[in-house]
A protein has these predicted regions:
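Structural recognition of the conserved hydrophobic beta-strand(s) that form the central parallel beta-sheet
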Residues: 117-123
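Preference for short coil/turn "hinge" residues that link or interrupt alpha-helices
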Residues: 29-32, 91, 121, 152, ...
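Acidic, glycine-rich active-site loops and adjacent beta-strand->loop/helix elements
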Residues: 96, 124-126
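P-loop NTPase motor domains
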Residues: 1-116, 131, 141, 201-204
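Conserved residues at beta->alpha junctions
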Residues: 51, 122, 150
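P-loop NTPase motor core of the ASCE superfamily
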Residues: 43-46, 106-109, 127-205
Length: 205
C-alpha cells in the first residue's frame, strides 16, 4: 500500500511539473529581470499578458501575482512602516482565467492598509465562485465598489438585491357613480426594488 501511495504522489507531482519539461519555460523561470521588489518605490507599469485560448501557462501568472502580493506586503512592513510610498494598483482583467492565487481571500482584506488596491474584473460572479468556492464570498465582501457593465440572469438578480429597496408613495382614487356620486382616495407607502432584475438586464452598458 505504501508503494502505491508513493507512486501516486510521484505521478501527481510529475503531472504538476510537466510544463517545466519545456526548455523555454525553465529558462524564463531561472532568473529574475522584473525587479518586482521595486514596484512600491517608484511609479512603474507592469503588463502581464496571457493567452485567452490556451490556459497551459496561466499558473505562471498566478505564481507571479502571489509572489508580488506577498513581496510588497513584506516590503511595506519591513521598510516603510506598513505603507508603501507609491500606491500600487492591480488591474486584474480576466481574473478568473489567471487561476487561483493562494490565500487571495486573506490578501484582498489586508493589502489596502499597505497602500495597495485591486480591481477584479470578471464576466460574472459565478466565475469567481467556481475557482475560489466558499472564499469567493469573502473576496466579494472586501470589494467596496462594484462597476456593473450589463448582464442577465443571476448577475442581474444579485445586483438588484445589492441595490436594496426603496419606499414609494402610492395613491389610489375611486369614484362611485350610484344614486350619489362619491369619491375616495387611498394612500399607502409601499416597498419596491430600487431597480428590478428586468430593468438592470436592459440598461445601457
Amino acid at each position: 500500500a505504501a508503494g502505491k501511495t508513493a507512486k501516486s504522489i510521484l505521478i501527481s507531482c510529475g503531472a504538476r511539473l510537466a510544463p517545466f519539461d519545456i526548455e523555454e519555460l525553465r529558462e524564463l523561470m531561472s532568473y529574475d529581470e522584473l525587479e518586482l521588489d521595486t514596484l512600491g518605490d517608484r511609479k512603474t507599469a507592469l503588463f502581464l499578458i496571457m493567452s485567452d485560448t490556451d490556459d497551459t501557462f496561466n499558473f505562471v501568472i498566478a505564481i507571479l501575482q502571489s509572489q508580488l502580493f506577498n513581496l510588497l506586503c513584506d516590503k511595506a512592513d519591513d521598510e516603510y512602516n506598513g505603507k508603501l510610498p507609491v500606491h500600487v494598483r492591480f488591474l486584474l482583467d480576466e481574473f478568473a482565467n489567471i487561476g487561483q492565487i493562494p490565500r487571495f481571500d486573506k490578501l484582498i482584506a489586508t493589502i489596502r492598509s499597505r497602500e495597495m488596491s485591486a480591481s477584479i474584473i470578471l464576466q460574472s460572479q459565478s466565475q469567481l465562485k467556481a475557482i475560489y468556492k466558499d472564499a469567493a464570498e469573502i473576496i466579494l465582501d472586501n470589494a467596496d465598489s462594484t462597476l456593473f457593465l450589463g448582464g442577465r440572469g443571476k448577475n442581474a438578480k444579485d445586483i438588484s438585491e445589492n441595490l436594496g429597496r426603496e419606499t414609494i408613495d402610492s395613491f389610489n382614487t375611486s369614484e362611485n357613480r350610484g344614486t350619489q356620486v362619491s369619491h375616495g382616495l387611498n394612500y399607502q407607502k409601499l416597498g419596491k426594488e430600487l431597480m428590478t432584475q428586468d430593468e438592470i438586464a436592459v440598461m445601457d452598458g
